Amino acid sequence: MNILVLLPANDRHRAILESSAPGEDFIYTSSDAITREQVADADVILGNIDPALLTACEHLQLLQLQTAGYDDYLAAGTVPADAKLSCSVGAYGQAVSEHMFAMVLSMIKRLPGYHDLQREHRWEDLGPVTSL
């Protein structure tokens, strides 16, 4: 089985991947450097690939996206009919929640405005701030 990995993977990550599927062939590349031959030979693709390249697939069994979104891969004929498409829905929920919470706090404390004033070397009061 040929497993095409488009995710950035250091030596530790590669060892983990390869130990999970001993004896399988792993090919590491990036979305920018991928070739049609690599796609044609892949049984499994881990990572996001240009959907147009999927027409080169000859025996793809699984496409595991690294993102939650998958709309670009839903067009008819994009992913071979007998292949499974998997994405990372739910993997980023906590990080997105924390980011939104940080942005709300930033806005109620007027941090963007104070940041702009600081860059301009102006020390002014932007008015009252609210509290949670």
Show the residue positions of the predicted features.
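N-terminal glycine-/charge-rich "phosphate-binding" loop or analogous flexible N-terminal tail
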Residues: 1-44
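Phosphate/diphosphate ligand-binding glycine-rich loop within oxidoreductases
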Residues: 41-120, 129-130
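Active-site-proximal loop/helix segment associated with metal-binding centers of metalloenzymes
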Residues: 126
